[in-house]
A protein has these predicted regions:
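Alpha-helical transmembrane bundles and membrane-interface segments of multipass inner-membrane proteins
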Residues: 1-245
């Protein structure tokens, strides 16, 4: 696949992510819930000032640092993707990197612009500027099962447990899926890449040997021609002298 096709995959992720966030922002209030699959899957509107899956970074300049880091990571991932495509890396790995890139860009858009255009910058602490301080919109909530730990269980007895409690978005899930597939199939991805590199190196070595062999034959042929020419030149004077006699 060409480089642009992997960026198209990332663009599709970005479009789905941003569309879902803007629809939730327009038609739902914060903390509203819509039950999709019983109690197992709900749309739950949350604003996340921090990282993926609701992880927060409570600091006046923490959000700015996080946004700058995300922007740097976004460009780094894009550069790495282009480099891996040119290197001929396994297609599955490149698709995973496209998913990660799409998710990274999706959350960068929230962090960079939503504070201004959706006016959702956090108010505690008050940011120095709304730019780069937008809160990420999360809405996917999968509380698959819940229970209360028995009192006799050490450390957690009597505590409420819910799986899966974090609320996230399409960008988060795209990054997570891309990373997990790479972790599970990295041996296959990089093994085939090494085979391709070895085959390319062997082909290059074979071509170099052919060129070297051709040059050697050409040099040998030219040397033979020079020797033959010199031999003919040596014979001509003797022929002339014999005719004079």
């Amino acid at each position: 696949m060409k480089v642009y096709k992997y960026f198209i995959i990332a663009l599709v992720i970005i479009l789905f992510d941003q569309t879902s966030k803007l629809l939730v922002h327009k038609y739902m209030y914060i903390h509203d819930e819509i039950y999709v699959l019983g109690d197992w899957f709900r749309l739950h509107y949350l604003l996340n000032p921090g990282m993926a899956f609701g992880i927060r970074w409570n600091s006046e300049f923490g959000k700015l640092a996080l946004t700058i880091f995300r922007i740097g990571a976004m460009f780094g991932i894009a550069y790495y993707l282009v480099k891996m495509v040119k290197k001929g890396t396994h297609n599955g790995f490149l698709i995973c990197m496209s998913l990660i890139l799409g998710g990274a860009v999706g959350n960068v858009i929230d962090s960079t612009f939503y504070g201004v255009f959706l006016n959702n910058a956090p108010i505690d602490p008050v940011p120095p500027t709304k730019w780069f301080h937008g809160q990420v919109i999360d809405m996917l909530y999968f509380p698959i099962f819940q229970f209360e730990w028995p009192q006799w269980v050490p450390m957690v007895g009597g505590n409420y447990f819910e799986f899966f409690s974090p609320v996230f978005n399409i960008a988060d899930s795209s990054i997570f899926i891309g990373v997990m597939i790479i972790l599970f199939f990295q041996h296959r991805f990089f093994k085939e890449t090494e085979k391709m590199e070895l085959a390319n190196n062997q082909d290059a070595a074979s071509e170099e040997m052919k060129i070297t062999s051709f040059d050697t034959e050409a040099n040998y042929s030219s040397e033979q021609n020079v020797i033959s020419t010199e031999g003919e030149s040596e014979k001509k004077p003797s022929d002339t002298n014999s005719s004079d006699l």
